[in-house]
């Protein structure tokens, strides 16, 4: 329902009449029974009305104040009473206002009391001249737990069943069950100044699921004393709003919070302005630095067997050894066999100092690592890094050379910039990489083909190179053999041709011309020659011939002078 606010002094007036008017007193009682639960911080869903109507109050008020009457009163909007002559014709005042207030009271009573109690006596008649008193509308009781925890923000008085249909009348927290009812109180005089009071947050704006700890049963601020008295009861204390502590947590947002939260206010003094002495503010205690996470620490699980515990237990980061001064002479390099024997006993284990250290484990009882060189690093039992900027990792690994690296058990790198990879590897020459030692060689496997001139080649690249070289050599040798064969054939044919030319007979002394044919064979190569001799003078003679063979043709000419 929407109403307009008016001041408490105006609430006692009706068309300019005094507060003794019966209608004004009834309205004041209804107004008090509806506002007090809101001031105590009760849930707002119990005061929801079924319909919205115009209020005869604050019509034409400054700042154009509109809205629910209860909400406006809680926010401090000044209320102004509208006389009957200014009311609308639709019955927006009088019995309609009483009907709305009865709906609010009935909704509150039904929501917090299930089922509602039957009133002991009928309600007083409503002396309104506009309409007869309406019948209260029954609303469906809201489902609330009977034993909900009290909210830590607002404490509520204990619950007691209602005493009448207009307003429930619970017992005061400090009143006894046999106490006689006290007279009803009315509003104070308009001239009396009231002390400003801090209002709690509006329950109408809070969501029910955000206040799970509110009490499902709300007690009425009105006492069960007689309604004829004009003085307020002595045992009625005004509740004060107390803001929650900074460390106070929402039970719904905090999974580990208890479902039943105790009220921070003491039940013995709800009207006191001083906090109770037995109320202690919870303090936040941070976890210790060495506190373990059960999910991240394997040894915290109760289902780990002793064997698994021995494998998964953490280790202790030992204190680094003391590095000797540069003025001291470093011990000479020795072989691993000359190292001191390992001390008996197992390594000490404890929780690692950081989360990343749990991925490193050391299990050895040998001597400590020793790094004598400048900027040298030695990791492992009895590891020795004696060269400058050297690195020795592994049991009894030894790096003696400058910037040498020895990785593996008993690995030795004594050369300058030498690298010994693997257990027992020895790199004793400068700028070398060793993967073994003489008599205990190793293969370097899974090597990619080399791409640059200084890259290593694998077996596939070597076989391809050999194959290409063999093919080239064979081709060249074949060509050479062919050339030699052809040369021999020509030579043999030439010898046969020359022999065939010499076989032609000469001319006689008494003849002038002679023609002859000759032939010869040399190592399987044959030749045929044709020639002739002519006597030109008595003392002069000329001779010519041609020989033919498989290697080619041969031509010869000769002349002789005789005396």
Curated annotation (Swiss-Prot):
Residues 1-20, 109-350 are annotated as: Disordered. Residues 473-509 are annotated as: Outer membrane translocation of the passenger domain. One of its GO terms (cellular component) is cell outer membrane. Residues 61-472 are annotated as: Surface exposed passenger domain. It is found in: Cell outer membrane; Cell surface. Residues 138-150, 162-197, 211-227 have a biased composition (Low complexity). Residues 228-238, 269-281 have a biased composition (Polar residues). Residues 96-130 are annotated as: Central and acidic domains. Disruption phenotype: During infection of host cells, loss of actin tail formation. The chain crosses the membrane at residues 510-519, 525-536, 543-549, 553-563. Its main location: membrane. InterPro entries: Adhesin_Head_dom, Coiled_stalk_dom, Pilin-like, Serralysin-like_metalloprot_C, WH2_dom, YadA_C. Pfam families: YadA_anchor, YadA_head, YadA_stalk. Residues 510-563 are annotated as: Translocator domain. Homotrimer. Interacts with host G-actin; the interaction is direct. Interacts (via central and acidic domains) with host ACTR2/ARP2 and ACTR3/ARP3. Belongs to the autotransporter-2 (AT-2) (TC 1.B.40) family. This is Autotransporter BimA. It comes from Burkholderia thailandensis (strain ATCC 700388 / DSM 13276 / CCUG 48851 / CIP 106301 / E264).
């Amino acid at each position: 329902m929407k109403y307009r606010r008016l001041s408490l002094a105006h609430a006692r007036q009706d068309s300019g009449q005094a507060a003794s008017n019966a209608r004004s007193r009834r309205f004041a009682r209804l107004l008090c029974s509806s506002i007090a639960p809101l001031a105590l911080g009760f849930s707002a869903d119990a005061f929801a009305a079924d319909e919205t109507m115009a209020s005869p109050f604050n019509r034409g008020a400054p700042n154009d104040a509109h809205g629910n009457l209860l909400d406006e009163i809680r926010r401090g909007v000044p209320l102004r009473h509208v006389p009957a002559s200014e009311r609308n014709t639709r019955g927006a005042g009088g019995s309609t206002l009483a009907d709305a207030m009865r709906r609010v009271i009935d909704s509150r009573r039904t929501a917090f009391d299930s089922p509602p109690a039957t009133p002991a006596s009928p309600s007083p008649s409503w002396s309104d001249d506009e309409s007869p008193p309406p019948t209260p509308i029954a609303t469906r009781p809201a489902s609330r737990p009977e034993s909900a925890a009290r909210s830590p923000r607002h404490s509520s008085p204990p619950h007691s069943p209602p005493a009448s249909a207009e307003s429930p009348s619970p017992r005061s927290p400090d009143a006894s069950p046999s106490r006689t009812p006290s007279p009803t109180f009315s509003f104070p005089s308009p001239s009396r100044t009231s002390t400003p009071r801090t209002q709690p947050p509006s329950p109408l704006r809070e969501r029910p699921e955000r206040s799970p700890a509110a009490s499902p049963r709300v007690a009425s601020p009105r006492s069960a004393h007689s309604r004829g008295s004009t003085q307020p009861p002595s045992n009625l204390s005004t509740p004060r709003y107390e803001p929650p502590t900074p460390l106070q947590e929402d039970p719904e947002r905090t999974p580990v919070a208890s479902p039943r939260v105790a009220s921070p206010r003491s039940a013995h003094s709800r009207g006191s302005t001083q906090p109770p002495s037995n109320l202690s503010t919870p303090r936040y205690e941070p976890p210790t630095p060495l506190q373990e996470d059960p999910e991240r620490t394997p040894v915290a699980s109760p289902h780990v067997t002793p064997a698994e515990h021995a494998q998964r237990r953490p280790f202790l980061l030992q204190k680094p050894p003391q590095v000797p001064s540069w003025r001291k002479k470093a011990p000479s390099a020795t072989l691993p066999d000359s190292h001191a024997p390992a001390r008996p006993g197992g390594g000490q284990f404890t929780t690692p100092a950081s989360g990343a250290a749990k991925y490193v484990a050391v299990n050895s009882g040998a001597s400590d690592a020793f790094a004598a060189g400048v900027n040298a690093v030695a990791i492992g039992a009895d590891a020795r890094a004696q060269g400058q900027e050297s690195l020795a990792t592994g049991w009894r690994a030894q790096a003696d050379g400058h910037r040498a690296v020895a990785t593996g058990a008993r690995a030795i790198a004594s050369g300058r910039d030498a690298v010994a990879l693997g257990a027992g590897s020895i790199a004793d020459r400068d700028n070398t990489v060793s993967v073994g030692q003489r008599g205990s060689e190793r293969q370097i496997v899974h090597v990619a083909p080399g791409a640059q001139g200084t890259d290593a080649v694998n077996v596939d690249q070597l076989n391809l190179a050999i194959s290409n070289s063999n093919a080239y050599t064979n081709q060249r040798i074949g060509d050479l053999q062919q050339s030699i064969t052809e040369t021999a054939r020509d030579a043999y044919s030439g010898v046969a041709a020359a022999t065939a030319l010499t076989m032609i007979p000469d001319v006689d002394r008494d003849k002038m011309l002679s023609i002859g044919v000759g032939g010869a064979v040399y190592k399987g190569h044959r030749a045929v020659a044709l020639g002739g001799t002519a006597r030109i003078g008595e003392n002069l003679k000329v001779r010519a011939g041609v020989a033919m063979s498989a290697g080619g043709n041969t031509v010869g000419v000769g002349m002789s002078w005789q005396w």
